[in-house]
Amino acid sequence: MMPKHFMTLCAIVLLSLTIGGLAFAQASKRHQQAVQQKPFGTQDGRPVTLYTLTNANGVEVDTMNYGGIILSIRVPDRKGQFADIVLGHESLEGYVPNPPYIGAVVGRYANRIANGTFTLDGKAYSLPKNDGPNTLHGGTDKTFNKVVWDGEPLKGKAGVTYTYLSKDGDDGFPGNVKVRVTYTLTNSNELVIDYEATTDKATPINLSQHSYFNLAGEGTGDILNHELMLNADRFTPVDKNLIPTGELRPVKGTPLDFTAPTKVGSRIDDSYDQLVLGHGYDHNWVINRKGNGLTLAARMYEPTSGRVLEVSTTQPGVQFYTGNFLDGTVTGKQGHVYKRRYGFCLETQHFPDSPNHPDFPSTILKPGEAFRSKTVFKFSTK
């Protein structure tokens, strides 16, 4: 017969193991790939839902079906400390309106179309002008950043698919266009964005994601100390209205040469004409590629935190924008005021104003065809 104190000790050990096992199971469950959703208000009489994507490493992405907007991305630094690295707001109301397009899916046509017009199959189309003489990010009314999409969480993955029908004539564009955007967060700390579209009439299509990143943490200051590499030997120079001239200019010998890692702020205020026109960087780079597959476009590194963002895409171009027009009038999360150059965008895309430049890669989607593109944001540290 065992002594009573020995039996008591065994019971305590068993209880401790049970409690520890439950705690471990709960912790593991918390860090499995998952999608959580909750009501986030209403817009235009339709419910808006917030989706939180979580992977096995504890990385989280918040997105909503209004505008396909990414509200937050929480990733660790080199010490394992998590921070939100995208500009944004804590409520739906902060995104209505959203002049800087913070976090949004932009379309039908991301970037600029000169003079708000293009000709297709012999017919001229007029679009709303919302950027001086130009149309920016699709116009003013039914642009993709201003509408409520249908949302459906993915099964067995940390992801969500948004779908939207852009009707014939919306913002002047032809064709009923069915659009699908899927966000998937992998256990490799990749946010994968898949874009798809079909149409019943020929129409231009150019879709992108307009998140503003600050790898030191949103609201912590400017991004001038970040170090950027762009896999691009050429860019598309612009005129005074930020419309491509049609030239594909070599970056070598210019402040737009990021073929080797370079501090964003080291040349941003040079007197080079393109920087003067853009008030900093706001240009499309021509990605070096050998085929149509996924290709590294950019790598950004923030030395204080050690965070790294790599952007790969199937698209031909990437717009690097340094938040030159953030002017302190936008107050974001935790009361942070977003001042000039407090965030950067890396917008994968077709070239700006392609419908008016037949020598650029075509953006015309025709009936019976499908537009598909993929962009991957990969987060790491060094």
Please annotate each region the language model reported.
Residues 26-59, 65-382:
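An exposed, glycine/acidic-rich loop-and-rim segment of catalytic or binding clefts
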